[in-house]
Amino acid sequence: MEESAGATSAQSAATSVSESPAEETILVCASEPVTVDGGRLLVCRSPGPEGFYKVPLGLKVALPTGYAMLVAQRGGGRTTNGIVDAGFRGEVQAIVAPGRPRAQFYCTPLRLAPGIATDVPFFEVFAPKRDEDAGYDIPCPRELVLPPGGAETVTLPVHRTDGRHWAYVFGRSSLNLRGIVVFPTPWESGPCRFRIQNRGAHPVTLESGQRVAQLVLTREPLGWITGRSPFPATPRAPMQHRPAWLFARDFVAPSSARGARGFGSTGL
């Protein structure tokens, strides 16, 4: 699915091209015309406490279980990568850092993987999730005190022992809005580690055990995520698994445990 920050006044359905004969349906409801490979200026006049902005994309998505939606940017803006759960029924929003008035957003479905092998029991380190959730919450392994502009590398007491599928660490929307940004990072082998930065103007203390990030397991690689940038930009086609879109009217999204709470990820 390629979309900038646009959408359609009618509801639309997407059928993904899967490895199996069965088709999966993605429901999309949005309020303005779709703009493919284009962009429009979104203005938000309600910044968060550290100046980060919530930018509503005029888009609602209902994904099947086993999928998530990735919200990213094209170009050199300052949009945090966002993960939207299959169970989210609210309006999708992007979190944008101050200092750049224009951004082009890119939304695409991700196929989630069932699991990976680790040297210690997986749930000794990562929190369990519901079937409709995208990622496993990551509790902070120790207290972190981040001064303005300060960053720390977080290393979890777990090693990956297989090469099946792909694993990525993403931030949480609620912390992003406070200026606490996780560098999206692949976990390829060895220990799980990632950087977290305070881009706000005030010191922040993250308590031991506080949820600071999420681990997302995917069936396709996201090669543009390297762990070196807090705001990585996606190329034109981030997925090998490409959805084929069919447009229709009057689809009703199934109910979910998550509903419209939060930003669409495990961020709230």
Curated annotation (Swiss-Prot):
Binding site for substrate: R172, S173, S174, F263, G264
Domain of life per record: Viruses
GO terms, biological process: dUTP metabolic process
InterPro entries according to UniProt: dUTPase-like (IPR029054), dUTPase-like_sf (IPR036157), dUTPase_trimeric (IPR033704), HSV_DUT (IPR034745)
Entry EC number(s): 3.6.1.23
Cofactor(s) for this UniProt protein: Mg(2+)
Enzyme class: hydrolase
GO function terms (MF aspect): dUTP diphosphatase activity; metal ion binding
Record field: catalytic activity: dUTP + H2O = dUMP + diphosphate + H(+)
Pfam families documented for this protein: dUTPase
Keywords: Hydrolase, Magnesium, Metal-binding, Nucleotide metabolism
Family to which this protein belongs: Belongs to the dUTPase family.
Role this protein plays: Involved in nucleotide metabolism: produces dUMP, the immediate precursor of thymidine nucleotides and decreases the intracellular concentration of dUTP to avoid uracil incorporation into viral DNA.
HAMAP family per record: HSV_DUT (MF_04031)
Protein name (database record): Deoxyuridine 5'-triphosphate nucleotidohydrolase
